């Protein structure tokens, strides 16, 4: 879990930490700066999805007083994600990024427990992953 109030942070030396969902979720610049020639980007939703910011902005308003930095990042999360996808698509056209994304999520959402739907999506992922070998060689 990543959102203050909904989840408890991990505290290290008195500083609360949450998972990376509020950070750079598509760190292409970092990967290339670290020396990668090519990047494989694995998405959990179809590549054409544009992330809406309505829910994030509402929650940001709720947590703003207690967690101002997290609220600021949460309010910008959709914008950052959409910009990252756009950049990934440009780099994919140049042959520098391979985007692996389901064409259909098979009804699977974050808390889905339907084993049949999960297996179907997993199998699609295995098939899609075959493109990685050709890309990195």
How does the language model describe each region?
Residues 1-137:
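Patatin-like phospholipase
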């Amino acid at each position: 879990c990543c959102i203050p109030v909904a989840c408890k942070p991990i505290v290290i030396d008195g500083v609360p930490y949450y998972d990376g969902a509020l950070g750079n979720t598509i760190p292409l610049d970092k990967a290339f700066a670290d020396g990668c020639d090519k990047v494989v980007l694995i998405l959990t939703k179809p590549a054409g999805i544009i992330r809406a910011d309505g829910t994030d902005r509402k929650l940001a308003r709720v947590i703003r007083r207690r967690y101002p930095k997290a609220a600021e990042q949460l309010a910008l999360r959709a914008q950052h994600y959409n910009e990252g996808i756009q950049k990934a698509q440009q780099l994919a056209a140049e042959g520098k990024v391979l985007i692996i994304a389901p064409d259909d999520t098979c009804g699977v959402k974050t808390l889905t427990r339907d084993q049949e739907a999960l297996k179907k999506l997993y199998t699609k992922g295995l098939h899609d992953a075959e493109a990685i070998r050709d890309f990195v060689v």
